[in-house]
Curated annotation (Swiss-Prot):
Cofactor: how bound: Binds 1 [4Fe-4S] cluster.
UniProt topology in membrane: Peripheral membrane protein
Cofactor list: [4Fe-4S] cluster
Designated name of the protein: NADH-quinone oxidoreductase subunit B
Source species of the chain: Citrifermentans bemidjiense (strain ATCC BAA-1014 / DSM 16622 / JCM 12645 / Bem)
GO cellular component: plasma membrane; respiratory chain complex I
UniProt keyword Cell inner membrane present: yes
Binding site for [4Fe-4S] cluster: C37, C38, C102, C131
Summary of the function given for this chain in its UniProt record: NDH-1 shuttles electrons from NADH, via FMN and iron-sulfur (Fe-S) centers, to quinones in the respiratory chain. The immediate electron acceptor for the enzyme in this species is believed to be ubiquinone. Couples the redox reaction to proton translocation (for every two electrons transferred, four hydrogen ions are translocated across the cytoplasmic membrane), and thus conserves the redox energy in a proton gradient.
EC number: 7.1.1.-
Lineage, opening ranks: Bacteria, Pseudomonadati, Thermodesulfobacteriota, Desulfuromonadia, Geobacterales
Top EC class of this enzyme: translocase
Gene name of the record: nuoB
Amino acid sequence: MGVDQPLGENIITTSLDSLVNWARKSSIWPMTFGLACCAIEMMATGAAKHDLDRFGIIFRASPRQADCIIIAGTVTKKMLPVIKTVYEQMPEPKWVVAMGACACSGGVFDTYSVVQGIDEALPVDVYIPGCPPRPEALLYGLLKLQDKIANERNSFGSSIGLGERLEPAA
């Protein structure tokens, strides 16, 4: 049994987009940015009862290791430059989740010091409403983010086949 023997039925063919999107959606590493009471619900979501690890979601403490940021709570204008800096430190591709009424729309705080929705500063991919949203809502929002990632179009070209011989470039 050598490498040259035909593989028969054991060949997998897929597009590179599908393969990369499957890997990205199956390993979301969010950075937590808890600013208010929503952070408590985010911690509860990461606990054993909801077990985000089974979906490949592992919280990271460093923006350089994260590909998603969860903005949970009230964003003040004084905190906004810090959030932008953290977002810029994240590698591409990156996604933003707005968790809670305050992060989505400013909540009940209609004052000069509160940002009326984080989407004024960052491109938000998923909004999770509630004050504060329950852990089930955050889990649902992260699953919706996985669906969005699975359907993204990348800049990769054709399909690849595992088991195909690739000729060296001349």
